[in-house]
Amino acid sequence: MSALMTCEPGRVIWITGLSGAGKSTLAHEVVARLRASGDVVVMLDGDDLREVFGAVSVDLKSHSRQARLALAIQYAHMCRILAQQSLTVVIATISLLKEVHAWNRENLPGYFEVYLKVPVEELRRRDPKGIYRRFDAGEITDVAGLDLAIDEPEAADWVAEFAQGRTVGVLTDELLNKLIEKQIV
């Protein structure tokens, strides 16, 4: 048995949603609160991971379904390695692919899937990275939820539907309460 497998398994909190949904914002707040309570937590962000794993890819700029799937499975494998070392992993990633959701449920210890469901109209209004503006201008393609089909999670452990005025603090409280209720943290 490998040394990784001798530890008590950790857990993976997988926060998914379209670009601009607030995944990273929520993840950072959840991580801060968990760390404040004494948990050892690793924060992973899909944008950072794309740079790390994509650096060895043939086409770093590709956002095709195939490229997204390959990267998301790599992210999931990294989460598993970390969770097998008794760590809590919080990951913020689009990864709206049924193959990823299924793989995660089957292979990640303490897996808890969060889906931030935000209408495209609201995402276009927020557009923190200019993705929706650039898509509308014809500058980019393969935008999840627009010209690239997504698979909404069918069995997310928690779905946070957009509500005007709902703050990240409120979302964080709701998520942490759900994690406690499900005995994830």
Label the predicted regions.
Residues L4-G10:
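Phosphate-binding P-loop
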Residues K23:
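Conserved lysine of the Walker
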Residues I15:
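Hydrophobic anchor at the beta1->P-loop junction of P-loop NTPases
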Residues S64-F112, R133:
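Glycine-rich phosphate-binding loop used to anchor ATP phosphates in small-molecule kinases
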Residues V90-A92, N107-R126, A160:
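Conserved phosphate-donor/acceptor-positioning beta-strand/loop module used by diverse small-molecule
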Residues G20:
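Walker A (P-loop) phosphate-binding loop of P-loop NTPases
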Residues K117, R125-E174, E181-V185:
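Small-molecule kinase domains that catalyze NTP-dependent phosphoryl transfer to phosphate-bearing small molecules
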Residues H28-H77:
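Conserved substrate/cofactor phosphate-moiety recognition/catalytic segment
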